[in-house]
Amino acid sequence: MAYRDQPLGELALSIPRASALFRKYDMDYCCGGKQTLARAAARKELDVEVIEAELAKLAEQPIEKDWRSAPLAEIIDHIIVRYHARHREQLPELILQATKVERVHADKPSVPKGLTKYLTMLHEELSSHMMKEEQILFPMIKQGMGSQAMGPISVMESEHDEAGELLEVIKHNTNNVTPPPEACTTWKAMYNGINELIDDLMDHISLENNVLFPRALAGE
C-alpha cells in the first residue's frame, strides 16, 4: 500500500508503532502531522520507499486502540490520565537530574549546559497549558460545545507548536539525547527519561491535534 500521500498524523494513529518509526527518523508527526509522508521524507532527505516498506511491516500487526473512532469524552479522560498526569511526574524529576548533572559535571565539554533552564521552561509552559485544557477546553468539548471552541483550540495548537520548538532545543542541547561515553548513571537515566518524555509528549500532541480537536470542531 502507498503511504506517501497520507498525512504523518494519520499514519501515526492508524499503524501500530508508526510513531516510534517516525521518531527514529526525526519526523514530526504531532505539530507537523498534517504534512504527507512524502513531504516529510523529502525535507529530511530520506528514502520514502524504505519508510513505506517499514510501515507496511508494522501495518500487519493489530492496533491496540483506534482513538480515531473513540468517544471524545473517553479520549479526554485518557489524555488526562495517560499524559497530563505523567508529564506532571516526569518534568520535576528531570529538572532535579539536570540540575545535578550540570553542577557535578560542569567542567566537562559534553555537559548539556542550559538543559535545566529549558526543562524548567517546558515544565512551566505545559503546567499552564494542561490547566487551561482541563479547566476550560475539555469541559466545553464534553458538554458538546466543541464547535464553538475555535478560539481556545487555536491557542492550544499554538502552545503545542511552542512545546515542539522547545523539544527541538532540548534535542540539540543533548546531542539528540545521546549520552557521551563518560556519562554517569544519573546522566544516562536522565537521557532515558527525556526520550520517554519526548515520545509521550509527541503522542499526546498528536492525539489532540489530529483527532480530538478536528472532531470537536466538527461538532461531535
UniProtKB/Swiss-Prot annotation:
InterPro entries, A to Z:
FeS-repair_YftE (IPR023742), Hemerythrin-like (IPR012312), RIC_family (IPR019903)
| Pfam families, per database record | Hemerythrin (PF01814), ScdA_N (PF04405)
Q: Is Metal-binding tagged as a keyword?
A: yes
Compartment(s): Cytoplasm
Name the keywords, alphabetized: Cytoplasm, Iron, Metal-binding, Stress response
Q: What is this protein called?
A: Iron-sulfur cluster repair protein YtfE
Origin species, per record, is Escherichia coli O157:H7
Where would you say this protein principally sits, based on its record?
cytoplasm
Share what the entry says about its subunit structure, partners included: Homodimer.
